[in-house]
């Protein structure tokens, strides 16, 4: 006997009924059925909708840690084995670390919270020890199945004001995301800090699986052994929105060193505020993406004059010197040579006066890139009738 009920609710019959249970093999002898597993149904449904497949039983899941400020570097310690590996054909699991909308700092082995720091302190070695296929710090990634099911978005109810990777801290995973959502704050990597994905294995999933990342009103720094397609961030408000991305800032302890960013697939910086790539930064990757509110292309002196007059739109300044710095990939630590530079603008590309962006190496006569990709809803040119803007 049994009671009929609605699954997941407290609604059920008061009276018991007679229930007959028939084994599946016996039932198949009584009639003929077209049977399909959940995984096969989900794959077929996703193909019909033209979107990536949903989560399947072969996929590993996510571990989410929501930490409170004031606990010091000893608030999180991990000396175990994380089981984030997927079954064959599945997506690897993720480690998601949140700071209860506080500031987050990540320090090196044995280090304590920085003097005067008010926020969540974590040691990089403890985060690396989980062995996750994807490490996300500052927000929770989500994919809503159905229309728009190819967008990886981030939960608007959680976030971090800022994230700083201190001197001596190195994050290592197949894929690392840092996200912050407070204007006036920053995602900062000090001199001597590093994010390295080389030799860590495959990312959980990437653009080749049909996914597109949308950071929303957040700044984002990401390194991956896969291919990342990233939309520009949305415009924020005075209290919530993208902040700066500062790579290679002087260390709080005064110790100088190189900031290292190495991946086998992609390096992405997304913000509509300041983006600083200091001379101390060494990076190597196959695909470099800058996603910004806009790009202002022209000589630095002219752009500075326009900004002083208050007529320069918000955006990242770009000239030949900046382009040359972006093309200085470093393959000395085993990273692949740079192949693709992607510049995605939310608003527009603005060209001022006579300007040229040249990817060719003067010594060899060959382009330092296989692909230069510009993504923008509009391209504007400002100058007189003789002004020429060129990209080569």
Short names for language-model regions:
Residues 1-392:
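Extracellular and secretory-pathway beta-repeat/beta-biased strand scaffolds
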């Amino acid at each position: 006997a049994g009671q009929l009920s609605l699954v997941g609710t407290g609604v059920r019959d008061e009276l018991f009924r007679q229930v007959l249970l028939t084994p599946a093999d016996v039932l198949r002898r009584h009639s003929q059925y077209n049977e399909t597993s959940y995984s096969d149904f989900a794959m077929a449904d996703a193909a019909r909708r033209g979107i990536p497949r949903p989560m399947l039983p072969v996929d590993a899941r996510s571990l989410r840690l929501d930490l409170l400020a004031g606990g010091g570097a000893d608030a999180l310690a991990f000396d175990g084995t994380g089981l984030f590996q997927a079954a064959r054909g599945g997506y690897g699991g993720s480690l998601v670390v949140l700071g209860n909308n506080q500031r987050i700092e990540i320090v090196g082995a044995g280090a304590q919270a920085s003097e005067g720091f008010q926020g969540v302190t974590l040691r990089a070695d403890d985060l690396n020890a989980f062995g996750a296929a994807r490490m996300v710090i500052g927000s929770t990634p989500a994919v809503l199945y159905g229309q728009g099911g190819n967008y990886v978005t981030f939960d608007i109810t959680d976030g971090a004001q800022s994230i700083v990777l201190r001197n001596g801290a190195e994050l290592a995973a197949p894929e690392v995301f840092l996200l912050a959502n407070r204007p006036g704050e920053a995602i900062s990597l000090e001199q001597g800090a590093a994010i390295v994905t080389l030799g860590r294995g495959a990312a959980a999933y990437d653009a080749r699986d049909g996914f597109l990342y949308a950071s929303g009103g957040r700044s984002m720094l990401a390194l991956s052994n896969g291919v990342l397609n990233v939309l520009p961030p949305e415009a924020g408000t005075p209290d919530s929105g993208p902040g700066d991305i500062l790579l290679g800032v002087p260390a709080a302890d005064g110790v100088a060193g190189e900031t290292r960013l190495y991946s086998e697939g992609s390096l992405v910086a997304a913000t509509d505020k300041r983006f600083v790539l200091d001379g101390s930064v060494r990076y190597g990757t196959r695909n470099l993406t800058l996603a910004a509110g806009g790009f202002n292309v022209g000589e630095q002196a002219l752009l500075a004059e326009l900004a002083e007059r208050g007529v320069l739109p918000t955006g990242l300044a770009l000239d030949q010197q900046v382009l040359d710095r972006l093309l200085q990939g470093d393959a000395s630590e085993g990273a692949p040579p740079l192949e693709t530079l992607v510049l995605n603008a939310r608003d527009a590309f603005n060209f001022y006066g006579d300007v040229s962006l040249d990817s060719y190496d003067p010594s060899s006569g060959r382009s330092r890139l296989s692909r230069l990709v510009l993504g923008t809803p509009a391209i504007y040119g400002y100058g007189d009738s003789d002004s020429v803007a060129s990209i080569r």
